[in-house]
Regions:
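N-terminal intrinsically disordered, cationic/polar leader segments
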Residues: 1-120, 127-173
Length: 173
């Protein structure tokens, strides 16, 4: 799960980059949607995924491009299928400008991309899913807000995870 991945990020390494960047541009660079005839009516069980993140650094231009990829698989509840009834995926390119790159390592950029890159792209992913479900003619899905929790916060770990994405969609276990 995405929250588990975030717990392995060295936030201190990400902060060093975060203090020096400004988000300059966000673009969708790759997307796909698939709708089966069975997928037009909910409610749905939904699985959200975040794939690997590509990080590109241009030292001359002092830019950092973070490319997070997200996907969603939706299964009509009680349809008993192994494959999703509809799928949505997108890769975003987040371009950041940097004040300077002094003393920044590849580990700093990786940590930043996996923490801030996902966090900054998440609202665009939410809007993309909302828009695509409307265009596909299925009940719109509202992706939950992205919450960062401290990696060693025992109190936060005790809180129950929200299982509902919205009234017409459930998060698949």
């Amino acid at each position: 799960e995405l929250q588990d991945k975030l717990k392995t990020i060295d936030i201190e390494k990400a902060v060093v980059v975060a203090e020096r960047v400004a988000l300059h541009n966000v673009r969708v660079v790759k997307s796909s949607c698939l709708l089966k005839p069975s997928g037009t009516k909910g409610p749905y069980e939904v699985t959200l995924n975040q794939q690997e993140i590509d990080i590109q650094i241009n030292k001359e231009k002092k830019t950092l491009v973070v490319l997070p990829s997200f996907s969603l698989n939706a299964f009509v509840i009680d349809n008993k299928k192994d494959s999703p009834d509809f799928e949505i995926s997108a890769t975003f390119a987040l371009t950041y400008t940097l004040e300077d790159l002094d003393d920044l390592s590849a580990e700093n950029f990786q940590a930043f991309g996996h923490a801030n890159g996902i966090y900054n792209a998440w609202p665009y992913w939410r809007e993309f899913v909302q828009s695509m479900t409307a265009r596909m003619g299925v009940p719109p899905l509202t992706i939950p807000v992205f919450r960062l929790s401290p990696p060693n916060n025992k109190e936060a770990e005790k809180l129950p995870a929200k299982k509902r994405v919205n009234k017409s969609a459930k998060k698949k276990k």
